[in-house]
Amino acid sequence: MENTFRPSRFLSLRATTPSPCTWEEIMQELTGERHAAATALFRALAAGEGQDAETSKRQQSQIKQNQPAFVPSVHLEGGRSSKHIKGYPGSIMVDIDGIPEEIFDETLERVRADPHSFLAYKTLSGRGIRVIAWMEGEVTEENFPAAWQTVNAYYARLTGIAIDRQCKNATRMSVICHDPDALYRPDAERMKFASLPSAKAGQIGRASCRERV
């Protein structure tokens, strides 16, 4: 199936004006050197290198807020709120966070190897994984929650890591950072509605995703 959807890119997390871009352009930003310095600095601060905790947290927030971001799950025009949604292309975002350090690499490889993973990369913190996968069939405002549940339950089972139910808003932004090993699979397999059982207890629904990067 041809994918013609152009996700909305924003100049920063504070920006409200969407600019359509291609998946290839997002991939080039992720794998190129444009955001390498900011990503490295953020991770150094997160590791507590050279700053007191309060100063480090403030600097991390500034870096994160200034990074560009994109909205992968809806077509937007004129803004970034629900009233600006013009369509649901079927692409669903997954936040995988809280991964124990000792199994992070294994978890990332499992995600990358899965044929449903369309886009996958390390988040700005270096401790999380962002995944985009596609649904088969029409996605609408009414069935978007079911589509989100289908995809997120799948990755919860695949990784054994809890997925936050509060991250299911369709206009959620994904920060663009530096990951030279980011995955882009244009021919990824699509998921079908109601083809998957519910995730195991504790795998969906946990702490707020507001601090995730």
Predicted features by range, described:
Residues 45, 49, 62, 111-115, ...:
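Hydrophobic, Leu/Ile/Phe/Ala-enriched alpha-helical segments that form helix-helix packing faces
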Residues 79-82, 118-119, 162-163:
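Generic recognition of flexible, low-complexity loop/linker segments
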Residues 88-100:
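Acidic di-acidic motifs
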Residues 99-117:
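Short amphipathic alpha-helix segments
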Residues 107-110, 135-160, 182-202:
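Helical (often loop-to-helix) elements that flank the catalytic cores of nucleotide-handling enzymes
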Residues 162-180:
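Acidic carboxylate-rich catalytic motifs and surrounding loops in phosphoryl-/glycosyl-chemistry enzymes
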